[in-house]
Amino acid sequence: MTAALAVSTAACGGSSDTSNQPSVNTDVTFESGTTMATLKSAGKVKIGTKFDQPLFGLKGLDGKPTGFDVEVAKLIAAKLGLAADKIEWVEAPSKVREEVIEQGKVDFVVATYTINDKRKERISFAGPYYEAGQDLMVKSDDSAITGPEALKAANAKVCSVTGSTPAEKIKEYADPANIVLFDVYSKCADALRTGQVQAVTTDNVILLGLVDGSKGDFKLVGKPFTKEPYGIGIKKGDTKFCEFINKTLTDAVADGSYDKAWKDTAGKVSPEAPKLPALGTCS
């Protein structure tokens, strides 16, 4: 399972222009023994994210991951006193996110990571920093699939990713034999393009990125049927790190860097910046 991981030590962002980087908190000090103090002292941080999610976490030809998740992660690193070039990016596909946190392969994960009770049995979450909703993506000329209720009537095969919340939820709407699972959403998009499946399901913002990159081949059905709060995955019980991240998020809203992170990434397709959801309790 860990063989699926890939690592990029490149700094993130679509440009090497340092004006696009968040302001680094160089004078910060932390309580001894906390995760924050450990990372500041080490002078580097390992962050898990997606490498195949347009607009949220996508590794470019230059080896640099870009997207909203990447920018949120950079904001946290900056508050730790670490510039973007001190980040080691670790690919964290859906099925290994808990594993890489538990095994210490990353210090935290920002990877379209829905907060739910099952995952909380293994790890803790800071945030949420964004709320998405599950939707469907189909071919642009498809008029039969108008929402999740239409999947059975159309006898449609639908694709999602192993270990993801959407893969579980779609079982309520599609016959089990018609659910196809891969390890990354880009393979689902390929399956839709070749006709192996008739729909792809995950959170609407992820699908929006796939639609944007499809050159008109795909469309979003546009009928979200869940609420998916995205959290930042950390080691279970690390309350102080959770509180630090939550304060970083509220500070980012106050100083405008949260809105900027959106506008520089997903906002290029969906211009209206989201509101920060109500933050969960750290415990």
Please provide the spans of the model-predicted regions:
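Periplasmic-binding protein-like
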Residues: E131-V138, L208-K247, V269-S283
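Acidic, polar ligand-binding/catalytic clefts
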Residues: I87-A150
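Bilobed "Venus flytrap"/periplasmic-binding protein-like clamshell domains
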Residues: P65-L80, T114, A132-K187, N204-L208, ...
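A ligand-binding cleft/hinge motif common to bilobed small-molecule-binding domains
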Residues: Y113-E121, K169-E172, R193-K227
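C-terminal motif of bacterial Sec signal peptides marking the signal peptidase cleavage site
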Residues: V7-A11
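Bacterial signal peptide processing site
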Residues: G13-S16
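Alpha-to-beta junction loops
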Residues: V45-K46, L82-D85, Q103-A111, A156-K157, ...
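Extracytoplasmic small-molecule ligand-binding "clamshell" domains
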Residues: N25-V109
